[in-house]
Amino acid sequence: MNEMQLKYGCNPNQKPSRIFMEDGSDLPVKVLMGKPGFINFLDAFNGWQLVKELKEATGLPAATSFKHVSPAGAAVGLPLTETLAKIYWVDDLGELSPLACAYARARGADRMSSFGDFIALSDVCDADTAKLIKREVSDGVIAPGYTEEALEILAQKKKGNYNVIQIYPSYKPAEIERKQVYGITFEQGRNELDINDELLSNIVTENKEIPEEALIDLKISLITLKYTQSNSVCYVKGGQAIGIGAGQQSRVHCTRLAGQKADNWYLRQAPQVLGLQFLDTLGRAERDNAIDVYIGDEYEDVLAEGEWQKRFKVKPEVFTREEKRAWLDGNIDVTLGSDAFFPFPDNIERAKKSGVKYIAQPGGSVRDDLVIECCNKYGMAMAFTGIRLFHH
């Protein structure tokens, strides 16, 4: 099939809409269930590229959770700790497959943003992963294949209308890509940059030591940024993105936004949060919302009289600013990638507050010396890649 008619484009008034192959060849995808829309396909094709590259770079199954053409999370399939399984709401599922662990991590990093996501999987979707997907609010999934049991499970979602796309992994797009804006066609070579160890070899700080685990995390960060709307910054720890700042005009606002998300991810692991006693009737999304408010500055919105009773069996104690800072100080060895250079050392100062120890960025600012000096002050190791990773 050379083309697929869609209900509408980005918005309901944008008709007609379709996806098609300009060269007349068949589309490299097959819709197994549902009727994906314009934005669904944008998320699916960007997400597929991301997980395909993560798998190639790490040798591990990979997953990403996309919203509005940027990843909310991305991860590889490392086993979950007991704490992570609990904060990702999968502690009742027993031991998960590596692919399911990858999606639990990708979805769990920023659960508020991942609500209603589009999922991309690097490997054939198995039953464990399908069970996890089934219980979450999601728009669809793309993968190179699905086991029979996985399809049976996904068919139970949205009364059989959940969007399930199979992509042919052998498909290789043309070297030149095009897009139109205001009737004008833009053409460029595809971004085929290989994110590898050599790209991270130019370490410009006094600290030259980047351990293997951090190198993997830096590659995850840069590959994630390659498919994130610019400007973008990505914090990674333990094989998963823990905070992604996307689409900001200011670099430091990217760093702050992603840093706050990384902080929230770590705060969810604090005893004060793990000990929250939710009402049995409260669903996962409502619990996520309650936690987000509880660990933020507006905590009274869920702790006020008449409000806490709607969410908790027992009124929680206030998680004070001092307690949160003390807990966050335990988050160490975080990696950070940036899709363009840091123009000022304020980015490094903010990154330090979220436990960053290893950094990868292109370099090339007139103030590189000040940025390096700030890294040296904190004993950070920073690599200059020499390559910008803008994505629009």
Question: Language-model features: where?
Answer:
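Conserved helix-loop functional segments at active or binding sites
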Residues: 53, 227, 264-268, 353, ...
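Flexible, glycine/charged-enriched surface loops at secondary-structure junctions
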Residues: 57-65, 164-167, 230-237, 267-278, ...
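Active-site-proximal loop/turn and secondary-structure-junction residues that shape catalytic pockets
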Residues: 70, 125, 237-240, 248, ...
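C-terminal binding/interaction regions
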Residues: 117, 121-122, 135-165, 170-172, ...
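Substrate-contacting helices/loops that form the catalytic groove of nucleic-acid
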Residues: 175-210, 268-293
